[in-house]
A protein has these predicted regions:
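PAPS-dependent sulfotransferase catalytic domain
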Residues: 85-94, 116-123, 127-132, 139-207, ...
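Surface-exposed cleft-lining segments at the edges of enzyme active sites
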Residues: 105-110, 160-172, 199, 233-247
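Structured helix-beta-strand junction loops
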Residues: 39, 127, 255-256
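The conserved 3'-phosphoadenosine-5'-phosphosulfate
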Residues: 47-48, 135, 182-273
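Phosphate- and divalent-cation-binding pockets in alpha/beta enzyme and binding domains
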Residues: 31, 113, 120, 140, ...
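PAPS-dependent sulfotransferase catalytic core
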Residues: 1-101, 106-107, 124, 138, ...
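Soluble or luminal CAZymes and related metallo-dependent hydrolases
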Residues: 64-71, 80, 109-116, 172-180, ...
Length: 273
């Protein structure tokens, strides 16, 4: 491999994830992570946001944790007490034994991975699946700005600060759903990329979760749903979007909004592509 660092020429890939929740940020990935976390047939990494593939070769990055692939794969190993706890919870909730069939993890920055990284991920696990969540670009951008600029700040944030944030390259990329979808589709096997709708988390959480579980190939039962089904996770402040910011975003993201609506028209309630 040229991009993903390894200690050996033939690393043990048994722990390589079977699926990745790709993001982007503020689209419901935390909700999805916690609602899949205790499914008896899924071993989901204990940590939401491992950042492994996003921080390759960047030891100075604040989220850098795993120097090489073997370290990352080793982090999927469950401690005895973790496995025992999952056995107990699964038996209590659904009379099911915790017996994971698939591994997965969720890092919302993976939606924007360079294609050379995506290609090596798929080379490691040709059958890997990905999930991209779709949210109205204006609402997603505002939610992300509240989390980044407003949360924990004692000072009011002015329009110019918001404008600078929204016009940044990273934020523009996160609104460009067609590009992130195309990049992953070019490398994943056919129908191994699921496009999910953020609004279904609110309007139809149970059917949406069932759709995701069917896509992943695990058993779907209402008994497997947990208390997080109707809980808003990782929320930002309730501050409503000022009209001047809404108008600015609607103008800035006009093409992205049109593309988003076309995608929704194509996928309906969500589907694999």
């Amino acid at each position: 491999m040229n991009v993903i660092p390894t200690r050996t020429d033939r690393p043990d890939l048994r722990n390589f994830p079977d699926f990745l929740i790709l993001g982007p940020q503020r689209t419901g990935t935390t909700w999805l992570f916690f609602n899949l976390h205790l499914h008896p047939e899924i071993l989901l990494h204990r940590m939401k946001e491992t950042y492994f593939f996003s921080t390759l070769g960047k030891p100075e990055h604040p989220h850098f944790r795993y120097p090489c692939l073997e370290d990352y794969l080793g982090s999927f190993d469950e401690r005895f007490w973790e496995r025992l706890k999952k056995h107990y919870i699964c038996l209590r909730k659904s009379l099911s034994v915790y017996r994971p069939k698939i591994h997965g993890e969720a890092t919302a920055s993976y939606a924007l991975l360079p294609e050379e990284v995506i290609a090596e991920i798929v080379a490691c696990k040709p059958g890997i699946k990905g999930i991209i969540m779709l949210r109205d670009p204006v609402e997603r951008a505002w939610s992300h700005a509240k989390k980044t600029l407003v949360r924990g700040s004692s000072e009011p944030v002015g329009f110019e600060k918001f404008r600078e944030y929204f016009e940044s390259t990273g934020q523009r990329q996160r609104a460009d759903y067609p590009s992130m979808i195309a990049a992953w589709k070019r490398h994943l096997a056919p129908v191994h990329l699921y496009l999910g709708r953020y609004d279904r988390i609110v309007s139809a959480p149970s059917p949406f979760l069932e759709d995701v579980e069917r896509f992943l190939g695990v058993t779907t039962k209402a008994l497997f749903f947990n208390r997080h089904l109707t809980i808003k996770l990782n929320p930002t402040s309730d501050a409503s979007m000022p009209e001047d910011i809404r108008r600015f975003l609607e103008d800035l993201l006009a093409n992205d909004i049109d593309a988003y609506r076309r995608i929704l028209s194509d996928i309906g309630d969500g589907r694999a592509v």
